[in-house]
Amino acid sequence: MDKIRTVSDTKRDFYNHHTRPINSIYRRFIEELLVEMHLLCVNIDFRYDPIYALGVVASFQQFMQGYRPEEDKNSIFSALCQAVGGDGEKYRHEAQTLLNQVKGMSVSDLIAMGNSARTGEPGEGMLYNTLQAIAKNPQFKYSRLFAIGLYTMVMEIDADLLKEQDKRNETFSQLCNGLNLSSDKLQKDLDLYRSNVDKMGQLLAVIEDALEAERKKREKAKQEVATTPEDSPAN
């Protein structure tokens, strides 16, 4: 019997793959995402799927905005996926494939596809196959990251719809019905996600203002040095 990996094992693997220091402002998010992915991957009912992958990618992109140095982000994402036995390129490729498939669709089309997948009607493509596998799996392990993936697909189709609470709730209620999922937990997770996105946006604005103020301060100091007359030489 294989030994179940611990959170410590996963964290150690992560820091073995990404060896550079992590910006302190973002460290908590990265470690919380890592733990969340770990707990899912060691759950006997969890099965990786492209909607979950999209949730991981979208969450990372959303909450890593403004990270410096920018070039470290790819290494961090790859390390997150590798630490739980995954492949960052696969996550990104399948996430983008889903977004490409929903382009040109309406939200009604997406809901109808979910209903067709549940009833076993013929269909094709990664999105349809994923929806059908979920709808047909009574042991499907729901996760917050799956909810974010579903949310990201709807955003790709109609971002304005998500701004109206009644329409948003009705949309996800219908999607959950098609997938044989309870919508209550999903909608609570999405409300929290939206709130955290807003808070992150506010934090980034504060950081940018502080950086701009510091830049202006340095520029002013340089100008003052440049315009200060040199002392006249002593006779």
From Swiss-Prot:
GO process terms (BP): photosystem II assembly
Entries under InterPro entries matching the protein: Thf1 (IPR017499)
Segments traversing the membrane: none
A Pfam match: ThylakoidFormat
Entry keyword annotation includes Coiled coil: yes
Entry annotated with the keyword Transit peptide: no
Protein keywords: Coiled coil
GO annotations of cellular component type: plasma membrane-derived thylakoid photosystem II
Coiled-coil regions, chain positions: 179-228
Highest rank taxon of the organism: Bacteria
Function, in words: May be involved in photosynthetic membrane biogenesis.
Family annotation (PANTHER family): PROTEIN THYLAKOID FORMATION 1, CHLOROPLASTIC
Family: Belongs to the THF1 family.
Protein known as: Protein Thf1
Organism (species): Rippkaea orientalis (strain PCC 8801 / RF-1)
Lineage: Bacteria, Bacillati, Cyanobacteriota, Cyanophyceae, Oscillatoriophycideae
Gene coding for it: thf1
